[in-house]
């Protein structure tokens, strides 16, 4: 039999197959090979009615995220608050390059719009992201249709209202709502283990996790690929390995001068590139010491 792991709890894996859910365990040979089944895995398994089954094989994964681990994701809703905490395009772009690198479709959702005196600034920013090709929504009514036929996870800085949003999408989840700490301006972690939940024609992960940014982009080429607008323009650069910093006849810098490219995104690209290069230099120094 073949199915999808929709929940993992205390060593048991709950596999959905043809409308039924089976409780299974992983055979010991997975541990010997250093393999662990995760929520989202497509697996082959054996199970009889009303009895414990066993996972026999894990199919190749198209992508994965960590903390909590979840695999084979179709899209991720990146939740950014308009206020408390303040909207941060640099942080948003960090989430976006993580998702681009993992081949996960991003959807940007702006929470707490009601706290703004005027929504125009956020809407103007939204138009810039939409021009790149991203879904950028500011209401639940805009978000819900995007969940159909997709496996969706939710990510965002602590305190942006991840639990609140999930409770609005599926009230039966009854996720604990975090509070904003007055002293820190940051939310407290109030999430739990991951599992899938059927809602609005798709599946969502019932955890507002993924507030950490563990992206493994290690070079300029990968970073370029993680910026869709740079990726499209870079085919017109004179040099194939153009980093869009100092090279002549760079299509990205030309687009910046003509106003075709949003300067904010280019500034973030340069900052992230500098961080990658600094990490590489630090790594080289550590290796030399050894």
Curated annotation (Swiss-Prot):
Record GO cellular component, one term: cytoplasm
Gene3D superfamilies hit by this protein: Nucleic acid-binding proteins (2.40.50.140), P-loop containing nucleotide triphosphate hydrolases (3.40.50.300), Probable gtpase engc, domain 3 (1.10.40.50)
GO biological process annotation, one example: ribosomal small subunit biogenesis
InterPro entries: G_CP_dom, NA-bd_OB-fold, P-loop_NTPase, Ribosome_biogen_GTPase_RsgA, RsgA_GTPase_dom, RsgA_N
SUPFAM superfamilies in alphabetical order: Nucleic acid-binding proteins, P-loop containing nucleoside triphosphate hydrolases
Residues reported in the UniProt entry to bind Zn(2+): 237, 242, 244, 250
Superkingdom classification of source: Bacteria
Main location (coarse class): cytoplasm
GO molecular function, one term: rRNA binding
Manner of cofactor binding, per the entry note: Binds 1 zinc ion per subunit.
Subunit structure: Monomer. Associates with 30S ribosomal subunit, binds 16S rRNA.
Similarity remark: Belongs to the TRAFAC class YlqF/YawG GTPase family. RsgA subfamily.
Protein task: One of several proteins that assist in the late maturation steps of the functional core of the 30S ribosomal subunit. Helps release RbfA from mature subunits. May play a role in the assembly of ribosomal proteins into the subunit. Circularly permuted GTPase that catalyzes slow GTP hydrolysis, GTPase activity is stimulated by the 30S ribosomal subunit.
Protein name: Small ribosomal subunit biogenesis GTPase RsgA
Gene: rsgA
């Amino acid at each position: 039999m073949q199915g999808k792991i929709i929940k993992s709890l205390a060593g048991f894996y709950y596999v959905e197959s043809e409308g039924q859910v089976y409780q299974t365990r992983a055979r010991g040979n997975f541990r010997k090979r250093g393999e662990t089944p995760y929520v989202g895995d497509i697996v082959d398994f054996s199970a009889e009615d009303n009895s414990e089954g066993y996972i026999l094989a894990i199919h190749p994964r198209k992508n994965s995220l960590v903390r909590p681990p979840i695999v084979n994701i179709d899209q991720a809703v990146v939740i950014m608050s308009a206020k408390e905490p303040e909207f941060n395009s640099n942080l948003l772009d960090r989430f976006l390059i993580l998702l681009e690198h993992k081949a996960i479709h991003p959807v940007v959702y702006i929470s707490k719009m009601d706290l703004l005196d005027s929504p125009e600034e956020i809407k103007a920013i939204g138009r810039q992201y939409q021009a790149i090709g991203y879904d950028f929504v500011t209401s639940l009514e805009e978000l819900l249709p995007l969940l159909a036929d997709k496996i969706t996870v939710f990510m965002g800085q602590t305190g942006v209202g991840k639990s609140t949003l999930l409770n609005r999408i599926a009230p039966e989840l009854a996720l604990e709502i975090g509070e904003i700490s007055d002293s820190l301006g940051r939310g407290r972690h109030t999430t739990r283990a991951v599992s899938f939940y059927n809602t609005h024609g798709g599946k969502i992960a019932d955890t507002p996790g993924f507030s950490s940014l563990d992206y493994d982009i290690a070079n300029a080429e990968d970073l370029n690929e993680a910026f869709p607008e740079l990726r499209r323009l870079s085919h017109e650069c004179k040099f194939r390995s153009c980093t869009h910093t100092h090279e002549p006849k760079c299509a990205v810098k030309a687009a910046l001068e003509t106003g075709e490219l949003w300067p904010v995104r280019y500034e973030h690209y340069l900052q992230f590139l500098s961080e990658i290069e600094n990490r590489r230099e630090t790594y080289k120094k550590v290796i030399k010491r050894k």
